[in-house]
Structures are given as structure tokens and as C-alpha cells.
Amino acid sequence: MELGIKGKRALITGGSRGIGFGVAQMLAQEGCHLHLAARSAADLDAARAKLVAAHHVDVTCHAVDLSDAANAAALARECTDVDFLINNAGAIPQGTLDTLDDTTWKRSWDLKVFGFIDITRELYARMRARRSGVIVNVIGAAGERPVASYIAGSMGNAALMAFTRALGAESPEFGVRVVGVNPGGTATDRAVKRLRERAEKELGNADRWQELLSKSPFGRMATIEELGALVTFLCSPLSGYTTGTIITVDGGACSRRA
């Protein structure tokens, strides 16, 4: 299937690892040139080397902390040519109302919630002015199915879902699309590391970590390639009538009855 996005340019925040890198791989496979933003210059350089070697596209790296609105504005000025913005940076820690302190809560929202808002504000204005562009917010399934043990993440993700729907309802007036993706459990390096640690503790062998997923849909987690493929399709003109909606990728977990 030809997606019709060869030569387009994309900015991916949190693009050096995990889901962000999965998105980068799939966009590069389609011939897109990339801007990758993340905090670690070393991780960015490693990601760039892999992408250039495999796909021969242009990859520009930006080592930046997007929890600071001024940094988001500066990044936007360096990426005025992008056709696609993929907001993916940030992770909100587990914790209940009683155990999660205000400092941790606010710091994580500065990156995951306000970080999305700040960079979107900058680039959405440019997309409106030229009447083209796609914004994909990679959010999280806890926004759809909130739990008290992940209260800050549930609330932050729900806020970003509302942000996506509101902006995506307005954006067609300006020739722009705004959509969201809610990943469930995804086999990132970080997630697998945690499962290996748990398997070592509970099963006595880290290599048995996949046994811990036996009750998950399909007995596994999503792959970063599956998430990347969806985001890439949403960026393409083949998904040109999709805006203001959220697609949940969790193997049906949010639709299950307890």
C-alpha cells in the first residue's frame, strides 16, 4: 500500500526510544524525513544512526527538555517545515492520591500534559496558516479507563484526550487534522525490563517474563511497530477524513467487562 507521504517531514517528541522510535522507524520506512526530540543526546544519536543506515532519510536531532515552554517554542522555530507533529514525550509515574506528592505530579504533567500543549500551540498555528498538517497525540489507555493507583496518569491522559477531541473538531476549518492514539501495554525496552525484573522475583527466572502476560489480550503486549504503523497511517492522506478522535490500541482491554 502506497501511503503517499514520501518526502514529508515529521517531528517526533520522545522519538529516540520506545513508541516514539517505533513511529520514527515506520515514517522513515515510508520515506519521511525526521526531526527527533528527546532529552538524551546519546540516545538521539543512536536512533539517528539506525534510521539513516536502514532508510537513508534525513534525521535531525534535538536534545531538549520539553517540560519548559520556552524550549518548546525554540524547538518549533527549528521545525517550521514539518508536515506532521507526533507528541509522544513524557511518562507519568504510578501512585495514588495519598502517595503521589505535588512536586512529582506537577513535574510529570509539565512534560506529558503541558509539553504536548506547548509544542502543539506553536506548530498548530503554523499549520493553520498554510492550511495543511497532521498532529497525532500518543496518549495512553488509562485516560479511557482510569484507575486510582495511576491517578495522575489517568487524569493527565483524560485531559489530553479532551484536548485532542476539541482541537480536532475545530481543525478541519483550517485544513489540519488532530488525532490521538491510546496505547495499552506496549513492549518497549523499559516495559520488558520491568517484566524481566518481576519474573526474576516471582518465577526465579527473568527469561520467563512472557509468562506474566498469559492473561493479557493475545497473551502479549503491543509492539512498537504496531503503534508506529498506526500513527504513520493516521498521518497519511489515506486517513484524510480522520480527526478529533482517539484510537485505543490495547487488544480490547478497555472494552472488557470486569
Segments from the language model and where they lie:
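Conserved glycine-rich cofactor-binding loop
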Residues: 9, 16-18
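Short C-terminal tail/terminal secondary-structure segment
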Residues: 19, 145, 232, 243-258
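Substrate-binding pocket helix/loop in short-chain dehydrogenase/reductase
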Residues: 96-97, 104-109, 212
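Active-site loop-to-helix junction immediately N-terminal to the catalytic Tyr of the SDR YXXXK motif
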Residues: 100, 146-155, 166, 194
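Active-site helix of classical SDR
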Residues: 120, 156, 164
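Alpha-helical segment proximal to the catalytic Tyr-Lys
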Residues: 125, 169-170, 240
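Short, small/polar-rich loop/turn modules that mediate ligand/substrate recognition or access, typified
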Residues: 172, 177, 242-244
